[in-house]
């Protein structure tokens, strides 16, 4: 592998490490149902792709140094990674043991447990596993990719998933110089508000060591958590299943979700989205006149190019659409119109202005406001929040991936 220059973690990457250290490991799992006549050939192809990706993208073999300090740096493992890839040994990234499972929920449960074993100080911070469905034909398998958020966010994970499954004969663009992904601030065009700039400046001054002698820590709200306050990750995965019977529970959606929140301690925006969609679908009256959408938009600039594998920082585009307008379009034409706006200069400007500033990582516990927020949303006149086919996991283009039947997306809950 080519050598590359080390660099410190940016604010977003540090936030993911802080989540990990706080006992809420942020990861993404993508599961694909594959039908392939030759299991050995399928695994051989996956292995070749994984090894190539590890050579091309240093972040896939990197680790993180000195996680007990705020000055985190990537460990460059390009030439001598602490894990060995050998055709006669167990692969450090691929688990091809074909564990028998009943379905994708079982896969998600196992992957959750494996993700808890990710070692920030050593790596690798991603894995690929092959599972065998119990009730399907012998040529059917689940392929699971699990990636730590510090390596790639959801959009980067989808690109990685595609590259792992593509036939080895497909030509690949060598891309840019083989280096770690650049810092977020070097790849984004954002338009922070004046208030945000002032707030960040004051915050930085208060947190500077030279200011502590004068302020004695007054106003300091941000500090890297010391090892004594760390929370150990769960040793056993805890994957919960939750369902709503709209015929019985259409007036208890918020109550049921509150019960779920009391049990799990957090709720993911995907569950929020599913709940309000179900609430709208279960409502027979005409009180919902407008559909509100929020769609993540890449903040990468075309002139500030970056590797495909390495994540993608996003800002939100929010739109309100009168329901009567939907009758003028097919789903395809309406989605295209919405997509055109997202990729227009106006849409990009909206996402950049909503982004504001990337702030430092706080060490205090953030209050759990999701209950009151969801209660307010569910009782509003237009609680529908959905981004149609433009989702926060990006567009998945399975061309050249023969035998891929279905894809599931799993996400660790946010603290």
Place the predicted regions along the sequence by residue.
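Flexible, P/S/T/G-rich "lid" or insertion loops adjacent to the active sites of thioester-utilizing
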Residues: 203-265
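Acyl/amide activation-and-transfer machinery of modular secondary-metabolite enzymes
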Residues: 21-36, 71-99, 125, 234-243, ...
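Non-catalytic N-terminal regions of enzymes
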Residues: 1-189, 193, 266-287, 398-415
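Helical lid/core segments from catalytic subdomains that handle acyl or acyl-like groups
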Residues: 313-396
